[in-house]
């Protein structure tokens, strides 16, 4: 997984600046799954299954997740901990660190632990 480096990124039909723009992302830090590589371009897929080619200068190592459904941010990495915030479906959060099936994340002004059951943007056995 990689994430968008900038708040406006062109996604193209093919792996070249000469290829037409398919659509434009306007969400900095959005995580994207790399499905192919060609020279300085990466073919990506997002959490809604949109796909296309992005120049590598517009991408960086992923440290973000998207919630696939509403979930709770907890004070500690257990569901028995105090809830800090309810996070909406589609919410973008930034990863601080991951342990087992949990990641400590920043969601707006909140920092807490999120279980990785309902997220997109990380391989579950991947630790940061």
Label each region the model flagged.
Residues 17:
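Solvent-exposed hydroxyl-ligand-binding patches built from regularly spaced Ser/Thr
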Residues 1-13, 24-28, 35-76, 80-101, ...:
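SH3-family beta-barrel domains
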